[in-house]
């Protein structure tokens, strides 16, 4: 330890004032630490005791432990300390020679001094906890430069510690300014998303809809930037529908199913099913009451809110149709939840049924709107297309003709609104019978029977005879098979357009399209042991290769079954 007797040291040493022996004798100096003082600094004690016979220099005083003093430290002291006296640390007059050298290097680790570490606040708290005052014979004084360095280091610690709590923009990974539109985002992405949804901007990617969006390239492609905003969970209402982008698409659809359309506070989530306490049981409703509930559940009309300027192009038409479809899907979830008994099914079953029939429901609604407009398809009150206008989309002419033919059949049958709402509900409930449990299957069958009875009741209100009523029921049910066939063609076409990057697909529409393919790919395959026996009796697939048949699903396959390709 260096002897601090030189006046040329950088840090001045503050000496203690001399105290009259009459005031020190038998008493203990116990000054209270001032709240303005911070952590203690080493100070120096001069040796005014001339009666010992030693010429002691001014030495730095750190802790009694440096001098091998075995007394308790300040933090461990529960009683009053003795007054500081040099006789505690140095021998009496008999000692000859130079002052005792102090070797601080003998310790393996630097000894932590309680005079340096204990802050004034800690000292006061310790005094209150132990119930005894902690006497200090010296009052530590901090130099201004040391105080300034300590403050800077504390601020640096706070700053470095605060960085661990920073959030990053979910879109471009820049520093987030806050929680905007349901996710953590920066000011730039927040403002971009706000402009896009307020002005209803429609962007087209000049490349392949796979542009990289980061801090440096977020302004390079508006279409991909808006697509990523939707992918990470930005919503127009500003409420977070899903937590991050790490959930599967099915989990995000389940979140929508449980959140959208829930305005009744009595609707609660119990287990895996959503139970509405105020919703009557389907068996408790008469056919007339059930039809009335189905008519009340009908979604509102969706407007494109955009003037389609001619000549129409493939990009304009597909952009408008996919935009309308995405909006209708949101209302479809609300419509399904309003069907009596649907929310009693398991949540996974609700999602699965919607995923299997969403395009059929959209198409039967399209036919209903187009009944009074021969030769045209009314996609919305402000968007209707003739066959010539729809032919600008590659591969859409065949689907357009099938839709016009099915609409013509609906017109011939003079479909009533009561019959229409029953058929629409039957499409949803009959889309798939493979549910998660036998209990859910039983509930679904009872609900389907109730809707079928309501359809029979609606037909019975006409002036037709019993034989004509049965014939009409058969014609209406056969109409459902035509709608499913057109739906499979439409799904095939939409999937091809997506693979060719012909049109951007956003949010719910893209998820539903992917879910349709995902569910179809989960169909059971035949084992290798069974394939030779089956192939011996069946003709080979037309597109089989030399390595054997490949059983893959195509959107055009009926009932979503896998077929050899």
UniProtKB/Swiss-Prot annotation:
Highest taxon above the source species: Eukaryota
Record GO biological process: cellular response to estradiol stimulus; estrogen receptor signaling pathway
Gene3D superfamilies (alphabetical): Erythroid Transcription Factor GATA-1, subunit A (3.30.50.10), Retinoid X Receptor (1.10.565.10)
Residue spans, zinc finger NR C4-type: 169-189, 205-229
Cysteines paired by S-S bonds: none
Region (Disordered): 522-565
Annotated compartments: Nucleus
Tissue: Abundant in the ovary and testes, barely detectable in the brain and muscle and undetectable in the liver.
DNA-binding interval(s): 169-234
GO cellular component, one term: nucleus
Family according to the record: Belongs to the nuclear hormone receptor family. NR3 subfamily.
Record note on domains: Composed of three domains: a modulating N-terminal domain, a DNA-binding domain and a C-terminal ligand-binding domain.
Self-association state and partner proteins as the record states: Homodimer.
Name the record gives this protein: Estrogen receptor gamma
Organism annotation: Micropogonias undulatus
This protein's encoding gene: esr3
